[in-house]
Amino acid sequence: MAKEQLSAIPAVQMKRTFQAPREKAFRAWTDARELAPWFAPSAEYSTVVTELDLNVGGQYCIEIHHKGGNVHKVMGTYREIEPPEKLAFTWRWENDPSASESVVTVEFRDLGPATEILLTHELLPSAEEREKHGHGWEGCLAQLAKYL
């Protein structure tokens, strides 16, 4: 698919407020021990962080295990790391080698005892993928709210 067509698909954007300080919310995204308990679309899944090199250019790899036995593996490269304000990384599903790489940006706004998170997932290849990822991120952010 041409780059012009990819950019025509609107990004997934979500803004949520979490009852946790910004540093704690940022750590939940950047520490493997804190990421694993919540990073899945629902309680039907468990997560194993197999790699997390939190440096610009560093790689991450996350396995999301469904109770029914399916395993989904997502991986990518960190592009921006600005603790505790911003995190940006590429996103690619291993089980779909034809899938194009997309980009996730997470911004953390300090609200004192709370944190506003703005999540943007862009360069998704189709409206269908945008919808699937939107539902997935809704679930992940709900899990994060329970975790924090």
Report each predicted region and the residues it spans.
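Beta-strand/loop substructures that line and gate deep hydrophobic ligand-binding cavities in soluble
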Residues: A88-E138
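A short, structured loop/turn motif at beta-sheet edges
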Residues: R22-E23, L54-N55, R79-E85, E107-E116
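Short beta-edge strand/loop motif at the mouth of beta-sheet-based domains
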Residues: Q13-M14, R33-V71
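Hydrophobic ligand-binding cavity/cleft-lining segments
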Residues: M1-S46
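Intrinsic-disorder/low-complexity, polar/charged segments enriched in Ser/Thr/Lys/Arg/Asp/Glu/Gln
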Residues: I9-K15, R22, T47, Q59, ...
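Hydrophobic pocket/interface hotspot
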Residues: A25, L35, Y60, Y78, ...
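Short amphipathic alpha-helical signal-transduction/dimerization elements
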Residues: T30, L141-L148
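Hydrophobic/aromatic beta-strand elements that line small-molecule binding cavities or substrate pockets
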Residues: R16, T50, V74-E80, W91, ...
